């Protein structure tokens, strides 16, 4: 009886790919792509990037031994096929779910995940470090960095290549070019040059010629080597886009078709034979094999699932209409003000859609700047604009602003320049997990002199804070807000200026005081209702500002309260609670203090409900902590 299983069903580890023919590898790639489409349609996740590197993923595991050889996937959101082929296929349904596998490579999840990733442009640095350690220890494993999907716009990638060219370690950099950012030449000469540089005979002869001339220690040999090098470089510069990489010290190969399995396998086998740093330029199509994703790559970069696997049409979800997202409120408010104020500019680091700055881009493209994956440059670019009298608003995810802390301090705050930082995805972000949670911004910004730090509790406050930052504060301002929906409150058409450093009362009470910052106000109110049911009357204040802190309000409340609780969606170390503790200590207050926030740990991935429950930031857990604290029974 014929085996009815698919070829993918026979793959239990990468070792099973070694015996497959090119045609079988092509079949396997198609099966992987089909399974990925079905998987994302059910569960959601990063999508188009993995579709684009399906053939490359299969070819890499066919040629290399990833139990020994090291593949570092830049960013990591394109590694779903890699995970399927490395013993995790049966767990892919748990991808990005609480208790399931991560959506990114993790060294503790599989020996095939050589380096943990999640942020862009890190792969070449990691690969260079791994290779240098290998050489010091006398190893012979191969090291590969797969980078692309925008990551080549990050300066760290070029810093790493510059160093790698100097180190001369055996590292293969694979440039996954799915945006045609490095325009490939076309025509017969280009095809001939690609075949020529990948030819084994050519590369062997090239090595022998260079070695022979190296033994001829005379001026004639040096002149001959220089002439040959110039001839080869000139040919490559004329026929391929690789001259830049050659100048950094990496031998350039390609571009080749990233969906042609035969070309990929041949090229990778040739790369194995070259003992120096090299770059293989692979042209792919983001979203390959799923027409809706090919035609609209940005929208299909990631998806929440629930779409038809042929048409891509997403099923409409029943229930009430969604409330506005904080990102939408921010984007619309900024456009509203910028239409009346030509000094306002908008800056993003490759996240126009995620931050809703695409609204600004459409309305005022001449004042919109997408600097690429270059957060440090974005901040200093904003500083330059502010110095010249503009009002730059720099929208960056909290987790990515970490990469630009030096620029925030040195280029903005030190000069007291009026840059507004719209810190998106502050707090927990859900399924993307620890590489993307915005858990530290209050902690790392709190110490910066002269920086005003605000956090809205709802959409209207976000509008008012943005207006206040642009028109009523002289100096740099940071506004942090979470991913997801606002509370659905009705928002005014006008803007109201907030008094810097002043909070507001949300609820009067006679028992413990809860001081909240940002969207934890809703949790505080719900916890307060639970405590009221137990006979504990709580007082709740929305502090609005971490810096300057409303010390007058704290002093007034602590004058009569015996117990104060701080509540924040930030690390418990160095954030809002720490600021309140510092003030109470300096003021010699006898009031007892309980700080509630994210633990001193990296929080896993999962739904927001699961993560709030795990971290003790859901209303029942907050109420229980306050009850035990107030009644004197906390551990």
From Swiss-Prot:
Thiamine diphosphate binds at residues 77, 118-120, 150-151, 178, 290, 375. GO terms for biological process: 1-deoxy-D-xylulose 5-phosphate biosynthetic process; isopentenyl diphosphate biosynthetic process, methylerythritol 4-phosphate pathway; terpenoid biosynthetic process; thiamine biosynthetic process. GO terms for molecular function: 1-deoxy-D-xylulose-5-phosphate synthase activity; magnesium ion binding; thiamine pyrophosphate binding. It catalyses: D-glyceraldehyde 3-phosphate + pyruvate + H(+) = 1-deoxy-D-xylulose 5-phosphate + CO2. The keyword RNA-binding does not apply. Its EC number is 2.2.1.7. Mg(2+) binds at residues 149, 178. Pathway: Metabolic intermediate biosynthesis; 1-deoxy-D-xylulose 5-phosphate biosynthesis; 1-deoxy-D-xylulose 5-phosphate from D-glyceraldehyde 3-phosphate and pyruvate: step 1/1. It comes from the Bacteria. CDD domains: TPP_DXS, TPP_PYR_DXS_TK_like. SUPFAM superfamilies: Thiamin diphosphate-binding fold (THDP-binding), TK C-terminal domain-like. Keywords: Isoprene biosynthesis, Magnesium, Metal-binding, Thiamine biosynthesis, Thiamine pyrophosphate, Transferase. InterPro entries: Dxylulose-5-P_synthase, THDP-binding, Transketo_C/PFOR_II, Transketolase-like_Pyr-bd, Transketolase_C, Transketolase_CS. The keyword Calcium does not apply. Binds 1 Mg(2+) ion per subunit. Its cofactor is Mg(2+); thiamine diphosphate. Belongs to the transketolase family. DXPS subfamily. NCBIfam families: dxs (TIGR00204), PRK05444.2-2 (NF003933). This is 1-deoxy-D-xylulose-5-phosphate synthase. It comes from Chlorobium phaeovibrioides (strain DSM 265 / 1930). The gene is dxs.
